[in-house]
Amino acid sequence: PEQQARLYAAHVLVIGAGGLGCPVMQALAATGVGEITVVDDDVVSLSNIHRQILFGAPDVGRKKVEVAAERLRELQPGITVHAVDARLTEENILASLEGVDVLIDGSDTFTTKFLAADAAEISGTPLVWGSVLRYRGDVALWWSGPGAPADGAGMRDLYPAQPDPDSVPDCATAGV
């Protein structure tokens, strides 16, 4: 009961309601995380639904964050879900992290990943980072900045600079 109460008191922000964000949010809601914020500015398309498990054919054309919020509330009534139909920017990301216990990045661009990592380090918010390319997936936990353990590491400790955009295929080209 004590651990369940801690989960219910937690606030997790998820960047991206796509192939990574959908199963992550479903698991967070199912385990009883009490407050979930999802940030995405895309709509559901037919090409999404085979891998984005919160969506179905009737959702095509609807905002991903709205559909995701509905599904999560159906799965776990009583949780709070904030649907933010926006793209995170330098201007809004730090405010978005206020009161957040964990940031989960399921975005599909290095610009967003580095923005999230920098904001997580500035705010001291633990960052769970995921990426996928074809049949390969990567996950990492980054935690540095205020309140982090002394031996914590941020993403820029391993990846100091963003890759050249031309050196990395986009999702459509890479078969994601």
Please annotate each region the language model reported.
Residues 1-176:
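Adenine nucleotide-associated cytosolic modules
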